[in-house]
Amino acid sequence: TQPESSAASDVYKRQQPSLVISDISTLKTLEERDFLAGYGEVAKYGLLGDYEFFCWLEENAENIRNRDINALITAVAHSCKMKSAIVIADEKEQGERALLNLGHTFCHALEAATGYSERMLHGEGVAIGSVLAFDLSAKMGLTSNEDPTRIKKHFEDMGMMNSINNISGTLPNADKLVELMFQDKKVVDGKLNLILAKGIGKAFIARDVDPNLIKDVINNSLAI
């Protein structure tokens, strides 16, 4: 229950920050795998809503991987600006904010399947999930087959996971992974909503996606 005092009411109000401070130098303290896992979330912003940013990431892959300070500043600042704009426009996640979940429904299923262990870090799951989302989009005729191929290559160039079979150890089959996906919060009335794309930088909310199509792209990723 929210306290009645005016001071307490002020505390509970939503207020977007007027300033975000990021100490980029801390990124240089991370182990390589942790750094690259974080990059999965950066690449997501280009994939969901900014084609030019994704092109910039491709062109600057080596600088980013080498942790060039100017490249890191650009990547982090642009990601923060994109997230801020999306959250401000949709604070209660009624629409556009859901785009931030690109790759995450696949990721959450893989995290559950791997026991939330070191076998797959969250950002690695986001990268794999983003590839799967574009694979599914291509399979549904929403985007070209070149898009998921291009995204896979970019993650490979960055030294990152880009398919389910990159994950060590035994994994459940496609039926079980889809079952895990249906435990996600984005299931509404028993129907799975996913973030898909009509091209790089053109993500949208797809409702009631056919589970059989999802199984197909998962099976392909397991077999690669």
Question: Where is each model-derived feature located?
Answer:
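Structural motif
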Residues: 9, 18-20, 125-126, 193
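Short beta-strand segments
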Residues: 13-14, 21-22, 101, 197
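Solvent-exposed alpha-helices and their adjacent loops that cap or buttress functional pockets
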Residues: 10-14, 91-92, 187-188
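C-terminal charged capping/lid subdomain of soluble metabolic enzymes
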Residues: 40, 142-224
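Core active-site phosphate/anionic-ligand binding loop and the adjoining beta-turn-alpha structural block
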Residues: 16-69, 73, 77
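Single conserved hydrophobic/aromatic residue that forms the stacking wall/gate
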Residues: 1-8, 12
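Active-site segments that bind and position negatively charged phosphate/pyrophosphate groups
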Residues: 55-174
